[in-house]
Amino acid sequence: MSALTESFGPVPSAKSKPPAARKPWYKLLYLQVLVAIVLGVLLGWLSPHIATNEWVKALGDGFVKLIKMVIAPIIFCTVVSGIAHIQDARKVGRVGVKALLYFEVVSSFALLIGLVVGNVVQIGHGLGATGDAAAVSKYVKQAEAQHSVDFVLNIIPDSVVGAFAKGDILQVLLFAILFGFALMTLGERGHRLRDVIDDASHAVFGVIAIVMKAAPVGAFGAMAFTIGKFGPAALGNLIGLIAVFYITAALFVVLVLGLIAKIVGFNIFKFLKYIKDELLIVLGTSSSESALPQLMEKLERLGCSKSVVGLVVPTGYSFNLDGTNIYMTLATLFIAQALGVDLTWTEQLTILLVAMLTSKGASGVSGAGFITLAATLSVVNPALVPGMAIVFSVDKFMSEVRALTNITGNGVATVFVSWWENELDHDKLAAALNKTIDPSDIETAVTTG
């Protein structure tokens, strides 16, 4: 029995029953979200006084909070169930080591690419800007908790209830791993509890299916407020930084992640099309966390092992943030160039090493990349911290691409680790990416079981 069948019931199959009728185009989630984003942009551009109303902003914030509401129970149920179904405890450790090794190698590439592009393009050179420390002081304060020792200690929750209440991914993940191992050691005595957790996972994904119906509303509110508050004219000379970041992130996905996909045996563009719903939701909310539950489910349908999905995806949301990594090195060089500060190669190497640590403190929440940037600058060269105000006004426009790159990177990482573990179902992979299985059937599988 497949991992998906164990979690969500029988999967619709063309061999077992006639294929379901295709949904009308106006009921397709990704089209609804896309239309909502366009309408949000128009409202923010044409009527910024309406778009910046707190109730419009609440539409986007409310949707993200609804998603975050169920992330902790989803991670707990998925990880515990995945580990409890494994008979060999050594396998969990093996998967974890492979995932972390992958994260470090790919994250290093992302950081290095941002550093190289920043030196070649020199987009901040000659700007002659000055920074405003007050504008970014709250981010610097939050960044104080991002140093390596505090980061490690913060993984350990003061209480299990507190970890769930705060929705801290790494704390919930730590408890879930320990609980899963404990359940696995119980043997047959733990089967009933394991089945209860499997059923709970099914129910929580049902909640997600309900919440996702509000995705277009959330995307509309978030995009309208963003455009209304900052507006196209607010970009000014910083449009160059945004363009360079967009192009760099796109090239990273196509070339680096594309090469990894080729090694595994699939096409990166087909993969992007497969997760288009999740990408559009992330685009509207600028938070990769908003698509975490759906991404995990789609990866299982893609043929990835349930145990690998349960371990790699939640961990990747803190340890494998490719878009954030590119942003940190590129933005650091931009700020230094804008302030007229010449960084030596030794200092730039320090940026690379420090960012490898500070980036691990970033979560999938919108704006977390700005906090990790503050952490990096405060360690490398405190004189650069006030310069964060230069990119503050346009950070929101880069946040979306950071989140899109992050979620794509985590998806590819999960497929790669499953392939590395010889637990990737290539038949499912080919069927899903070649549309033999319609991704829209996921909602049916969740809601009907």
Curated annotation (Swiss-Prot):
Predominant location category: membrane
Pfam name, any one: SDF
Cellular compartments annotated: Cell inner membrane
GO terms (BP aspect): L-aspartate transmembrane transport
Location of region: Disordered: 1-20
Coiled-coil intervals: none
Record keywords, A-Z: Cell inner membrane, Cell membrane, Membrane, Symport, Transmembrane, Transmembrane helix, Transport
Low complexity composition-biased segments: 10-20
Membrane topology type: Multi-pass membrane protein
MF GO annotations: fumarate transmembrane transporter activity; malate:proton symporter activity; succinate transmembrane transporter activity
Residue stretches spanning the membrane: 28-48, 66-86, 101-121, 167-187, 205-225, 241-261, 326-346, 370-390
Signal listed as a keyword: no
A single cellular component GO annotation: plasma membrane
Sequence similarity: Belongs to the dicarboxylate/amino acid:cation symporter (DAACS) (TC 2.A.23) family.
Purpose: Responsible for the transport of dicarboxylates such as succinate, fumarate, and malate from the periplasm across the membrane.
Protein name per the record: C4-dicarboxylate transport protein
Organism annotation: Rhodopseudomonas palustris (strain BisB18)
Taxonomic placement: Bacteria, Pseudomonadati, Pseudomonadota, Alphaproteobacteria, Hyphomicrobiales
